């Protein structure tokens, strides 16, 4: 037997293992479902940053855990003057979605008052002063999630609730 034969056999085994892993990743990409279910003002306190909460439901139909390595979502509200980006969600940790499970997770996004656009700031100022204000009932979210070996775009309209969960 030639000295190269074990290496060729080892290379073949490594190739089979790689292709098997690749097949699992492709399968996982086809079996991951997500839905941004809603956006709500979470914290509304003058002495602290405004906080928006974004709920995302993940469903993993694959037989392996899926690890989401990056998630990036811009949140837009449609005011009378047009659509305005109010926040960007970018969690710093990976998210593990266990095999064959559904998981709804809340993500909080802090926004400094000075970083709000003029229209949103005016609406919040009116609200602080006790005036009636009109708020959008839906938000537009745009971004992507990246997992092991694949990227899924996010682009949808979701319900928005301007009633803060935590307030002064």
Go through the PLM ranges and name each one:
Residues 1-22:
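Single-pass alpha-helical membrane anchors
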Residues 50-52, 71, 103, 139:
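Hydrophobic core residues within well-ordered beta-strands of beta-rich domains
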Residues 113-168:
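Terminal connector regions
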Residues 56-65:
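Asparagine-centered strand-capping/turn motif at beta-strand->loop junctions
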Residues 81-122:
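Intrinsically disordered, low-complexity Pro/Gly/Ser/Thr-rich segments with frequent PxxP/GP/PP motifs
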């Amino acid at each position: 037997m030639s000295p190269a034969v074990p290496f060729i056999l080892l290379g073949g085994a490594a190739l089979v293992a790689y292709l098997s892993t690749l097949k699992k990743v492709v399968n996982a990409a086809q079996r991951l479902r997500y839905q941004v279910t809603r956006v709500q003002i979470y914290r509304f306190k003058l002495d602290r940053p405004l906080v928006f909460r974004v709920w995302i439901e993940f469903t993993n139909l694959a037989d392996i855990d899926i690890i989401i390595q990056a998630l990036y979502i811009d949140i837009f509200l449609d005011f009378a003057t047009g659509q305005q980006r109010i926040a960007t969600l970018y969690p710093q940790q990976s998210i593990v979605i266990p095999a064959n499970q559904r998981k709804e997770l809340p993500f909080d996004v802090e926004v400094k008052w000075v970083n709000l656009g003029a229209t949103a700031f005016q609406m919040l100022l009116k609200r602080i002063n006790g005036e009636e204000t009109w708020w959008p009932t839906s938000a537009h979210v745009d971004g992507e999630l990246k997992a092991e070996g694949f990227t899924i775009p996010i682009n949808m309209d979701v319900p928005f609730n301007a009633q803060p969960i935590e307030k002064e």
